[in-house]
Amino acid sequence: MNVIATRAAEGFPRRSFTVAEIRAMVDAGIIAEDENFELIDGEVVPMSPKGNQHEVVKAALNIELARQKSDDLRLGIESSVYLDDRTFLEPDFVLYPKRILPEDVRGADVLLAIEVAASSMKYDRGLKARIYARHGVRELWVVDAQTRATWVHTRPQPDGQWGSIEKVSADSKLAPGAMETVSVRMADLD
């Protein structure tokens, strides 16, 4: 579905929405279920269309994560993560304990969030990374869909900073701190 974004109200106050209001609009058919957007501090933010390279990396990474994750973990693919009553994000992947239902996942439950970025690199490494940290997501990977280099964010801080951000080359092995069973070399994905 194509979404028309506007900046007509730039500089003017805008109405803020809650997660509950957005869910009600989706349930009522006002917003289509397949519409790609996130809610950030009450503001609806349309997401960029995904290009070929993004989809290639995402498909290969999906196979690896599903194959390697332990049975006590759930792998969400473009699942909404409700961080507070005015914010939800939709990472490409999210790993969290299986005992938690998808709609109940909160920031501190997320062991690993992964964003595959092509045109959204600045947004994913900037604003979204700060939001994930502020809400206690334990680890964030932002993968460059072109080069497959990955920025690994660990030790989230309540002020939205990360204690560590390391750029890892595509040839190096990535292993999330909270999951012993998962390791990936982005260069091996095809």
Q: Can you annotate each of these PLM segments?
A:
Residues 1-190:
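Gly/Pro/Ser/Thr-rich low-complexity, intrinsically disordered segments predominantly at protein N-termini
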